[in-house]
From Swiss-Prot:
Origin superkingdom: Bacteria
Protein source organism: Myxococcus xanthus (strain DK1622)
Assigned protein family: Belongs to the UPF0386 family.
Cross-referenced InterPro entries: YjhX_toxin
HAMAP family xrefs: UPF0386
Segments crossing the lipid bilayer: none
A Pfam family of this chain: YjhX_toxin
Protein name in UniProt: UPF0386 protein MXAN_1729
Length: 85
């Protein structure tokens, strides 16, 4: 699976225990996402476009409105891309 460098870095943070938090406006539209590392740092590479690409490919998911975490498919994409480099 073709995964960009930005997506790989975000997936790597999520695999280490990070999470993606979403921010919505008063109309319920998604305006901003923040990728937070397990140490509490914010990853600047995680833009709305990267988030939408990861979600569209089902590499991340949310359970009951919680933060977005990496899925098994995301872990496979992360492990598969590290073997080719």
């Amino acid at each position: 699976m073709n995964v960009s460098r930005k997506e790989l870095r975000v997936l790597n943070v999520l695999a280490q225990g990070g999470r993606i938090l979403k921010h919505k406006d008063e109309n319920g539209r998604l305006t901003h996402v923040a990728c937070v590392t397990p140490e509490g740092w914010q990853l600047s590479l995680c833009t709305l476009e990267v988030f939408q690409q990861l979600k569209r490919r089902k590499l991340i998911s949310s359970v009951k409105g919680g933060p977005y975490l990496i899925t098994r498919l995301g872990l496979q994409a992360l492990c598969g891309s590290s073997k080719t480099r």
